[in-house]
Amino acid sequence: MTGVIPSLGRMPSLGKLATHGRPDYWTTLGRIQSNMALDFTSATISDTLAARGFTFTRLGATATRVNSSGVLETVAANTLRIDHDPTTLACLGGLFEEAGTNAIRNSTMVGAAAGSPGTLPTNWGSPAYGPAGISFEVVGTGTESGIAYIDIRAYGTPSATDFVRISMETNTGVVAATGQTWCVSAYVALVGGSFANTTGAGLGLLERTSGGAFVADGNTPITVTSGALAGKRYTYARTLAGGATTGAVVPQVLIRGVTSGNPIDVTIRIGAPQLEQKAFATSYIPTSTAAVTRNADALTLGDLSRIGFNPAAS
């Protein structure tokens, strides 16, 4: 006999442990029997689970975690993820999530090339947008703590007041509809220049028609600083409200508050961008040419008699 209990941010006591909603970090499983307490921060938890009759499943090798060294890494199928704080390296416990899809087709910067203006990653909106007088440079790409990134410089004296927009998808690449909630996330750091003569960075979600015409826009400021990229993951969720003409959504990193006649020179690092049809961000899902889905995590105890459960007495 196998029971099914949803995870609500705490560990249920028996049955199949599955997630329904935001990511859960599970640190202990108790309330079963004194000799069945499970420590999900232990390095040997996977062996302990197997020895006690539990089966962990997650199809596919697209799930990621932050390891004990602070490096973002992919994890093999059917392998429990023990996650860590990317800044303090503290163990957060077992990471259990529902299924999720990264709709950004290229989050690993495939096809990007340094230069002025250089080449943005394949399937990104190209070129980057800014008011007249603003130029762009792809400074380079690389990997930092397992996070694939691109460095983009925006500089010059604008002749109009507007935002600088770096679109991480084409105008029609992600099909969407009004009423849907989408969440964009990305690691962002300042690596050159400053935000002088701007109001700082931001994340945005731009609504367009199925043919790519502008419909509506929403964005939020983010406080971007210099330093290590790890720990600088920002998110923005928005319910699309453009009406019947909305047919696509475009995730963007912004430089906000650029004003006419005031020069700017800023270089930002963008890493591991993600776009999900959810109200919240889940763990990063790498992509290179197409949207990718991470399957749900599930922990099952097939024989509840092993924890003293007698179905005849229930």
Report the location of each language-model feature:
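Extracellular and organelle-lumenal recognition/adhesion modules and their flexible linkers in secreted
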Residues: 2-314
